């Protein structure tokens, strides 16, 4: 019930050897609640477009208004966040073992902090270990992950990027780090994750052994 797949790039080291962990937020540490199709309809964004990329290409006034709507929508969701299966236990176990932990989200830092507070992890991550879309170019850009590599003074392969979507995997691979996919049972992106496990609870079990 735990193992799904382990790709060849992970063979050189076990998950338990990883001491530097960067987590996506929404859908990884929390139960996914964003209705991206609805957001795109509300903001008149084509369904096939990425929201942040689309907004970045708009005239300043229009982009500002739409970012304000998006922020208000995200704020309401953040306050009501629920932890994903095993997420709190995994983060607490890694914290207890002295691992370095970071958050890399396409949301904004202040709302990531609201979310962490809502799911009971508000005391774990220092402000500088929470990187949102205003601190670094958003995923799939590797910029945010490269920030953590430099901040922690570690080689890229010593860091694992944990997420539930292809942008997390693309970010990790572009930065030269390990990649761990959770909460995506069918794995629509084969070959991109070093590890593919059911959820954070399964990650904790694998990490312990």
Residue ranges and their predicted role:
Residues 1-21, 109, 115-209:
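Asp-based, Mg2+/Mn2+-dependent phosphohydrolase catalytic module
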Residues 36-40, 71-74, 112-115:
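Hydrophobic alpha-helical core bundles mediating ligand binding, dimerization, or RNAP-core interactions
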Residues 1-62, 68:
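Active-site neighborhood of HAD-like aspartate-dependent phosphohydrolases
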Residues 76-103, 109-113, 142:
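Short, acidic loop-to-helix structural element flanking the phosphoryl-transfer center
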Residues 63-74, 124-129:
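Short, basic/glycine-rich phosphate-binding loops at helix/coil junctions
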Residues 51-53, 76-77, 133-134:
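A short acidic, glycine-rich active-site loop
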Residues 31, 103-105, 181:
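Hydrophobic residues in well-ordered beta-strands that form the structural core
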């Amino acid at each position: 019930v735990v193992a799904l797949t382990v790709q060849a790039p992970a063979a050189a080291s076990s998950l338990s050897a990883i001491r530097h962990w960067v987590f996506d937020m929404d859908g990884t540490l929390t139960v996914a609640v964003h209705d991206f199709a609805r957001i795109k309809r509300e903001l008149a964004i084509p369904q096939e477009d990425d929201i942040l990329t689309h907004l970045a290409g708009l005239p300043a006034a229009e982009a500002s208004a739409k970012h304000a709507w998006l922020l208000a929508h995200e704020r309401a969701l953040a306050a009501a966040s629920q932890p994903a299966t095993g997420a709190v236990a995994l983060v607490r176990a890694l914290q207890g073992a002295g691992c370095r932990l970071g958050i890399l989200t396409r949301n904004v830092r202040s709302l990531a902090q609201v979310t962490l507070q809502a799911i009971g992890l508000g005391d774990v991550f220092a402000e500088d270990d929470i990187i949102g879309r205003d601190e670094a170019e958003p995923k799939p850009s590797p910029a945010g992950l490269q920030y953590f590599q430099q901040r922690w003074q570690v080689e890229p392969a010593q860091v694992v990027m944990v997420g539930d979507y292809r942008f997390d995997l693309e970010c990790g691979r572009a930065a030269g780090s390990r990649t761990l996919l959770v909460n995506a049972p069918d794995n629509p992106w084969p070959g991109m994750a070093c590890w593919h496990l059911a959820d954070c609870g399964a990650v904790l079990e694998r990490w312990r052994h």
